[in-house]
Regions:
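DNA-recognition element of transcription regulators
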Residues: 108
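Catalytic donor-sugar/metal-binding loop of nucleotide-sugar-dependent glycosyltransferases
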Residues: 75, 98-102, 111-129
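Acidic metal-phosphate-binding loop of nucleotide-sugar-dependent transferases
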Residues: 18-19
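Acceptor/aglycone-binding surface of glycosyltransferases and processive sugar-polymer synthases
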Residues: 1-3, 8-10, 22-104, 131-137
Length: 137
């Protein structure tokens, strides 16, 4: 909401524990500026690019994304990714007050709602590195 209220044309979301590399923001922005409405920093668009996750967590994440893709028809490989760049119009159109879920379901709902509204979604491959310090909320 802050990005919308302050007039930004592109709004990015990422983990702030450096699981997402800030250097990749440029690639997400470029893909959005080239005509994509939502750009996902994807762990799974080119194989599996996850470092230091237990195998059980990796398998659960990977197959959950496959399941969601089958059920929803979302044309992306990493449906639960939290590293994204939105064009302003997407967030204004989907109505953030109508988003109901939290956590991973929030990530899916945002992408699915944008997709159902006809927005173009693209993936950019990233390497996700599990945090070494801190905890998830």
């Amino acid at each position: 909401r802050w990005g919308l209220e302050n007039g930004f044309d592109y709004i990015c979301e990422m983990d702030c524990d450096f699981s997402h590399n800030p250097d990749d923001l440029v690639r997400l922005y470029r893909a959005a500026a080239e005509g994509n409405d939502v750009v996902v920093g994807s762990r799974y668009v080119q194989g599996v690019n996850v470092v230091n996750w237990p195998m059980s967590r990796l398998l659960m994440s990977y197959f959950a994304s496959k399941y969601v893709r089958i059920i929803t028809g979302l044309p992306i490989h990493d449906t639960t990714a939290g590293f994204k760049c939105y064009r302003r119009e997407v967030l204004e159109t989907i109505g953030l007050d109508g988003i109901r879920f939290k956590g991973y379901a929030f990530q899916i709902e945002m992408k699915f709602t944008a997709y159902k509204c006809g927005f173009k979604i693209a993936e950019v491959p990233v390497i996700f590195v599990n945090r070494e310090l801190g905890t998830s909320k």
